[in-house]
Amino acid sequence: MQGLIGRKIGMTRTFNSDGSSIPVTVIKISDNKIVQIKKIEKDGYSSIQVTTGVKKFSRENKSIIGHFKKNKVELGRGLWEFKVDKNSKFYVGQVLSINTFININKVNITGISKGKGFSGTMKRWNFHGQDASHGNSLSHRAPGSIGQNQTPGKVFKGKKMSGHLGYNKNTVKNLFVVKIDLEHELLLIKGSVPGSKGSDLIIKPVVKYFSDKVL
């Protein structure tokens, strides 16, 4: 299923005909270029490898630069793959534009969520914390017991504890496409999407429709 790579610009709002406001995320979709076409005969599966944007040669390693030069494609800021039908008619160097999403009502968007650093259990897992008074000393935000005694003599895997929060690859499905601005290459999506401003997003047309509700 072919998709496109976009860059998150930020959030704003637009208005319906009845005057109600809709929160939207603005995504900039610059031209995506096909760097490589993988075929079942050689690679074991059928897909296209795409890039977007531009990048200085001094900021990339030689193996990636060689990969782009071999296929005579301008160096982009990353590489992404999309599985496609083996009979699809694509070619190296082909430009995939925002026109791909014309007549598409819903999309799935994948991105890297905002990193929150090392977080405690109250922020990370929504623990309610311990008593504010009644003998509590310096343990107001502590997680409490993390196990039993000699039996089982260990902390079970998956125990909710403090640790790194955020910066995960997340996919939000069935998001409405509110508007497509072909002139400025902008895609307006209803609601929020993973990632901070300036982060790259993978945008794909939906396969499963969970609702026929429209704006």
From Swiss-Prot:
The keyword Transmembrane appears for this protein: no
Protein name (database record): Large ribosomal subunit protein uL3
UniProt keyword terms in alphabetical order: Methylation, Ribonucleoprotein, Ribosomal protein, RNA-binding, rRNA-binding
HAMAP family associated with the record: Ribosomal_uL3_B
Residues with N5-methylglutamine modification: Q150
Gene: rplC
PROSITE patterns: RIBOSOMAL_L3
Protein family (similarity comment): Belongs to the universal ribosomal protein uL3 family.
Subunit structure of this chain's protein: Part of the 50S ribosomal subunit. Forms a cluster with proteins L14 and L19.
UniProt cross-references to InterPro entries, sorted A to Z: Ribosomal_uL3 (IPR000597), Ribosomal_uL3_bac/org-type (IPR019927), Ribosomal_uL3_CS (IPR019926), Transl_B-barrel_sf (IPR009000)
Described function: One of the primary rRNA binding proteins, it binds directly near the 3'-end of the 23S rRNA, where it nucleates assembly of the 50S subunit.
PTM statement from Swiss-Prot or TrEMBL: Methylated by PrmB.
Keyword Ribosomal protein set for record: yes
GO cellular component: cytosolic large ribosomal subunit
A molecular function GO annotation: rRNA binding
GO BP term, pick one: translation
Region (Disordered): 132-151
